[in-house]
Amino acid sequence: MVHRVTVGWDGSAVALAPLEWAARHYPDAGSFELVQVDGGRRSRGEPLQDVEDAAEAFRQAHPSFEVSAVHAQGAVAEVLADRTAPDALLVLGGRGNEEQRLGHRTSTAYRVLLRAEGPAAVVPQSFRGGRDVVVGIAGPNDDPCVLLSAAKEAVSRRQRLVAVHVARPLLGLGLGALPGDPIGHDRDLSEYERMVDAALAPVAAAHPTLPIVRRVVRGRTADVLLAASRNAALLVIGRDDASPIDRRPITHSSVLLSRAPVVVVPPGTEVD
């Protein structure tokens, strides 16, 4: 369960989307806090609202929530990452203009996601809703918290869970398959499907009535996940802390280009 929701606030219209999104989907969170990093970069040409005023307006709109406003000093990514925890959710805004997002190769949101000690979400300003919760399955060594977190999101939204594993054969060949060998190709896919079933076993046990769709797709991981979640309500992906920071393009691409909100779940995230 998410016990606290922290929303990064920069006073712009981009910050409004994650705030309302969080209120809608996490009504049982114990508290909401809006964090404004004073001196941080703001969006040019947009009307700005101070964090205190924003917190008061949010409190008036949602009187059942405990709401606090925080002024902080320092580097934006570091300040926000320091406020994360395994039982809390950090929510950030994302640009709605895809071309504009393409230019931000080292986005603040991405830097926060790399350091966060708990789950963190990026909500595109242009998001208007969708169907299904899509989750990426990297392999048999995935932390169970990733799939269980995605399942819980699907249950709370009354949506299907669409579990996607992207098979990336070495040098274009399936494991144990020869070029043009359909039997080897089918055997390769069946092995991946068994792995997906095994990974989803804890989810099926915890949520026996949850509709689950299993997909094994060949292609580039980022492209497949973005296509699968194009009209989704949510995309959930795990964070591989074993990979070097400069070799995590999947999370980066998803944050920059996803049309759906993205939740990145680090190892050790608490799931009730």
Please identify what each model-predicted range represents:
Residues M1-G45, D132-I183, A204-A205, P211-I212, ...:
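Small/aliphatic-rich secondary-structure junction motif
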Residues H3-W9, A15-D28, F32-V35, G39-R41, ...:
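N-terminal membrane-targeting/anchoring modules of bacterial envelope and secretion proteins
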Residues V14, G39, R59-L90, N97-E99, ...:
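Structural beta-alpha unit
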Residues P27-D28, T84-A85, E117, V155-S156, ...:
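Short conserved AdoMet
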Residues A69, L92-R111, G130, R230, ...:
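Glycine-rich, Arg-bearing micro-motifs that act as flexible, cationic patches
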Residues V91-G94, P119-Q125, V262-P267:
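Short beta-strand elements of ligand-binding domains
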Residues G103-S126, P179-G180, G184-R187:
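Extended, non-globular alpha-helical segments
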Residues R160-H252, P261:
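Structured core of small recognition/catalytic domains
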